[in-house]
C-alpha cells in the first residue's frame, strides 16, 4: 500500500510539473511572438501622407487587422484540422514570413509599405491556435491556458516598452522599430519553440476528465456549430465587442497616453499591464480548482459579467472626473481582459468537456476571432472616416461604458441558453440509462444544472 501511495504521489507531482512547465513555455513563446506584431504602434508617423483620406497610422492598423481577420477565417479550417506533426517548424516558418514583411515595411517607402502590415499579420494570426493545441484537453488547461492568454496582456506592453526604448535611446526611426524589435526576440523564440515541443501529450486522467481532442473536418464543424448555434452566436457577438475595444486599446494605446499627457514615458505601457496580467492570471488559473466542468462553465460566465462591469463603471467614473487617467487605463484594461481572456482559455474548453462533444477549441476560437477582427476593422475605419477629430480617449471611454451594459445582458442570455440545454440533455440521458430519480449523484447534477 505504501509503495502504491508513493507511486501515486510521484504521478501527481509529475503532472504538476508538466503543467507548470507548459504554462511557463507557452507564456514565453507567445510573448516572444508579440514582438513581431505590436511594436509598430509606438510610432507616430507624423510626417507620413494620408492614404485614401485616412491618417497613415490608421491605415497601418487597418491593414494589419485585415490580415488578422482573414487569417482567422482561414484558420477555422487550418487549426481545426491541424495534426500534431511539425507544429514547431510551422510556428517558426510563420514568424519568419511575418518578420520578412517587417523588413520590407522598413525599406519600402510610404505609402506603398502599408501592404506589408497585412502580410505581417496573416501568418501571425494562426500561431495562437497552433500553440494551444499543445495544451488543450488537460485537467490543467485552465491554468496553462490562462498563462498563454495573459501573455499578450503583458507582452503587448512589454514589447512596446522595448520598442519605445529603441526609439528614444538609439534614435531608431518609426519604420525600423518593428523589424529591430523582432530581432531582439528571434533567438529566445527559437529556444522557446524547441521547449514547447517537449511538452508531453495529455495523460489518461486528462482524457478521462476532458475527453480526447481530435481534428474536425467540415461536416463535423457544421454539426457541432448547429447543435449549439444559439448560444455560440451570442458568445461570438460578446467576443466581437470585447475584441473591438481590446484591440483599440492595444493599437492606439500610445495615442491615448499622448492625449492623457503621458506619451513620453516608455514604462507606462508596462506599468498598467503588469498588475492586469497578475490579477487576471490568478483569477483564471484558480479555475483549475473547479473540477466539475458544468460548474466551471457557469463560473466563467460570471467572470465575464464582472469584467464588463469593471470596464463600464471605471469608464463612467473617468468620464465624470472621479478616476485618474492612469487608474482608468488600468481598470478598463482589467475589465476587458476579464471578459476577453476566458474566451481564449476556458469557456470553449469547458463547453466541450461539459457536453462531451468531440471537437477542439481551435475551431470555436477561430470562428470567434474572425468576426472579432471584422468588427475591429469596421470600427477603426468608421472612426477614422467620420469622427477623426474626436480624441481616442473620449471616444473609447464612452464606447466602453455603453458596451458594458450590452455585455452584461448578453452574457446572462448565453448562460441561460447553456443551462437549459444542459438540463434537457442530462434529463434525456438519465431516462435513456434508466437512472432512478433518487440517485444522489443525479440529484446533485440536476441541482447544479438549475443553479
Question: Language model features by range: what are they?
Answer:
Residues 38, 230-262:
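Extracytoplasmic gate region of multi-pass secondary transporters
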Residues 141-168, 184-185, 365-379:
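Glycine-rich segments within core transmembrane alpha-helices of 12-TM secondary carriers
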Residues 94-109, 288, 304-320:
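C-terminal ends and interior cores of transmembrane alpha-helices
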Residues 58-79, 275-283:
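Central cavity-lining transmembrane alpha-helices of secondary-active solute carriers
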Residues 40, 125-140, 253, 338-356:
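Intracellular juxtamembrane helix-capping segments at the cytosolic ends
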Residues 112-127, 322-340:
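Hydrophobic core of transmembrane alpha-helices in multi-pass small-molecule transporters
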Residues 1-17, 167-236, 259, 290-292, ...:
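Intracellular loop-helix junctions on the cytosolic face of multi-pass helical membrane proteins
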Residues 265-292, 307:
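Transmembrane alpha-helices of Major Facilitator/SLC transporters
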